[in-house]
Amino acid sequence: MDIKLINIGFGNIVSANRIISIVSPESAPIKRIIQEARDAGMLIDATYGRRTRAVIICDSHHVILSAVQPETVAHRLSAKEASNTAEDPAD
């Protein structure tokens, strides 16, 4: 299994293999998920004090806050996967 890394802004990098979803923080259920992760000590704030624009939920139950738009993170993720399949057509 290859480790794929995604830049989530300000030099912060997350393992793409561990990402379950990338969502906007605006809805009440997502705000509740953020608060529950904060209470459980599973929240990683990678916003550097800026406004949270994307919430990344990982398979380890960690919740990561990013100041980058969800579309940008998703685009980086899909571009990374596309470049990996282009490099290794034997898979």
From Swiss-Prot:
One Pfam family matching this protein: RemA-like
Residues in the signal sequence: none
Taxonomic superkingdom: Bacteria
Entry similarity comment: Belongs to the RemA family.
Protein name per Swiss-Prot or TrEMBL: Putative regulatory protein DSY2730
Source species of the chain: Desulfitobacterium hafniense (strain Y51)
